[in-house]
Structures are given as structure tokens and as C-alpha cells.
Amino acid sequence: MATVPQQIPGVATNSFLSKERTIAAPGFNRWLVPPAALAIHLCIGMAYGFSVFWLPLSKALTGVAACTPEMGWFEELFASCNWRVASLNFTFTLFIVVLGISAALWGGWLERAGPRKAGVVAALCWCGGLALGALGISMHQLWLIWLGPGIIGGVGLGLGYISPVSTLIKWFPDRRGMATGMAIMGFGGGAMIGAPLAVLLMKHFSSADDPGVAQTFLALAAIYFVFMICGALGYRVPPSGWRPAGWTAPAGNASNTMVTQRHVHLNVAWKTPQFWLVW
């Protein structure tokens, strides 16, 4: 008769993606974390390079007129005319808006779930959004481009943006500015690498009646997924109470203390009118 394995009392069974499985072992080299963070930020940073797609997509249908300026945006979502550049560029607006909203909504979840799980979810959303965008281009449905790269991809941007920053700051409390700068450098450099790569891919896939953007989306999704998953699996978090050798936290002083002593939690802050005025 088969026996059912019993869980040892006091020992939790954690999944491979759980935060507990990412706690670094003693002697772990913290300088192995920045490459993992850069791998994710270089991929999602391509959001700033999407402008290379707008002109080819505005001429995607051969022998078809462009959508007229009088056409409403809702009608254009399902129209069979060539899309306007302004309508395509709205995808970037969705990127940035959803990035901020998702970072605010799921920032607390990231701290509980850990950067590895957040990195995997970011890869699925960002690359899945690109794949859905490729489908939208093939079907000539603008709403799928807004939904795929814009909204779903925007969620991947938000999670992919904050997880490297949060992790690096934990590993480099003595060099917070440098840690944040390394992560942001990757986000800004993503377009510098991704945009020329996208242009080369479009030239490779293009034909007389196809600008090759859909195939480029799929190729980028595959490339980015590999790098983002490798980056997410490379994440480690320091054990509780860890600090760099020879470093002691600076004593509190006027330059480091908060202006207010009320320490408003995010769950309370977002319910205040001041939060929305700043946002």
C-alpha cells in the first residue's frame, strides 16, 4: 500500500519561486546580483524604443488608405485602415501609466513573494504582451496592441522595474545610490540596444507587403523571455540581519530622518487627497 509522505512539523515546504528559496547562502558574493538585475532591466527598457515600430505599422496594409482624422479612437480600434501614428503612440502612454499603477499596487506583494517570483511574472507579462501584440498586428486589430504590449506588458514593466531596484538596495545598503543607478542604467540602456536590434529584425523579416513587425515582436519576446527568466532565477536576497562586512549603519541625524514622524503606510497614503494630488 502506498504511503503518503508526511510533512515534518515546523518545516515549511516552499516552492522554487518562493522568497525563502532565494535567501543567499553564507559567503554569497553580492556582486552576482547586479547582472541578474541588469538582465531584466535591459529587456523591459525596450519600452522606450517602441517608436521604431510606429511608422512601419502605420503603413502595414499595402494599397490601403490611412484612417481619417475624423475617425474616433474607438472606431479605429477595429478599423481596417492603416493606423495613425498618434494612435499607435498611445501604447507608450499605456506603458508608463500601467507601470506606475502596477508598481504601486503590487509593491507590497513583491516584498512578500520575493524578487524571483516577481521577475518570472514580469517576464510572462512583458513577453506575453509582445506575443499578443504580434497577434494584433497579424489580425490588424489595434485594441490587441493596446491590450498586449500596452496593458499586459505594462504590468510586466512595473514588476520588472521595481524588483531589481528593491533587491539591489537590500544588497548594497552601503552604496544605495550606486545600486539604484545600476538598475536604472539597465532600464535606460534597454532602448539603446533593443531599438537597433528591432530595426535589424524588421529588415530581416520584411517583404514587399509586410513590414515584419509581427515577426520582430515574436523574436524579441523569445529573446527577452530567456534573459528575464535567467535574471529572475539569478536573484538572491540577503538573510535577515545581513550587512556588508565592516559596515555599520550610520547613526540617525537630521539629514537622514524623515520630515514627518507620522510614517504613513502606503495602505493609508493612497486614500488621502494629498497622494492623488502628487500622483
Place the predicted regions along the sequence by residue.
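A structural feature recognizing the 12-helix transmembrane core of secondary solute carriers
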Residues: 1-279
